[in-house]
Amino acid sequence: MTLRACLFALLLLPLAATARDCTPRVKDGWIRLLPGGMPMQAGFGRIDNHCPMPVTIVSASSPAYASVELHESKVVDGVNRMRAVPELRIAPDGAAVLQPGGLHLMLMKPKATLKPGSRVVIEFSLKDGRKLLGEFEVRKPVP
């Protein structure tokens, strides 16, 4: 390795340490409570990445649900379609907005009865092995 390459690598070390220590944040998380004990609910909010490196969410889970998946709704040929999203990449200084009609969390088979005002913790697994926790408030659907 040349001296120039060694110096360049040394200059990058603080950036790598900063990126590793930087953690994205979940904001404004909420869950739409559906009537009649439906086995599926949807979660919304925002995940901000103020880090200098991209982050990738590869899965989600919660002790309150049997299963949590990232999904996306899109209109294709005039028909609303929903599909699972295997990974969600968030650019440096970017955000992922989870909202009705777009990216969202599918929360399947609640393990207990949830009521408006309840709080649910959802854990997001990042591609680099780190975990990100977010708190989501259960809300009644807006009529």
Regions found by a protein language model. Give the residues of each.
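Bacterial N-terminal signal peptides that target proteins for export
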Residues: 1-7
